[in-house]
Regions:
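Short, well-structured N-terminal submotif of metal-dependent ribonuclease cores
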Residues: 1-38, 50-62, 140
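Acidic catalytic patch
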Residues: 37-41, 63-90
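Acidic, metal-associated active-site segment
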Residues: 94-110
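Acidic, PIN/NYN-like endoribonuclease modules and their adjacent C-terminal/linker elements
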Residues: 70, 74, 105-141
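Residue-level signal for well-ordered alpha-helical positions
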Residues: 14-15, 49, 88, 124-125
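Alpha-helix capping/helix-boundary segments
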Residues: 7-8, 42, 80-81, 99-100, ...
Length: 141
């Protein structure tokens, strides 16, 4: 299972309405931390959002360490991820989202995201790549 950056933000004390990691810790969903992978680009994106919001660096360092300790972290520079991400640019404009989606596709793992464009194209993605796109709401129902 690949998770989008949104779900990592609470680790850096950035508030979101979709605290999936808290739900996992409290066993409100059937996902385990060891089943989750993220792309390294999500770690960068978390740092960038935290810097923009002026989150104290120590909280960001703690978040990054927790991510690397808890989840499988996939590099964004793998050739197959790059190739798939370039193909996805025809549909998804945000290149970081392309990388995250390409990670799910190349690993053949489902993606949990709140990205409206990815969710809008979920049927096409499922038909072409045989992975499911899920939202927080769908996971927690």
């Amino acid at each position: 299972m690949i998770i989008d950056t949104t779900y990592l933000l609470p680790l850096a004390r950035i508030g979101v309405d979709t605290d999936l990691l808290k739900d996992i810790a409290e066993k409100r969903v059937r996902i385990r931390f060891e089943d989750i992978a993220v792309n390294e680009i999500s770690v960068f994106e978390l740092q960038a959002k935290a810097a923009k919001l002026r989150i104290p660096p120590r909280h960001v360092v703690e978040a990054v360490e927790a991510i690397h300790k808890t989840f499988r972290v996939e590099p964004f520079h793998k050739p197959e991820i790059i190739e798939v991400s370039f193909k996805l640019r025809k549909t998804i404009q945000d290149y970081i989202d392309c990388i995250i989606l390409a990670t799910a596709i190349t690993l053949k793992e489902d993606l949990i995201t709140e990205d409206t464009l990815i969710i809008k194209n979920r049927q096409k993605i499922k038909e072409n790549y045989r992975i499911n796109i899920l939202s927080y709401k769908e996971i927690t129902e």
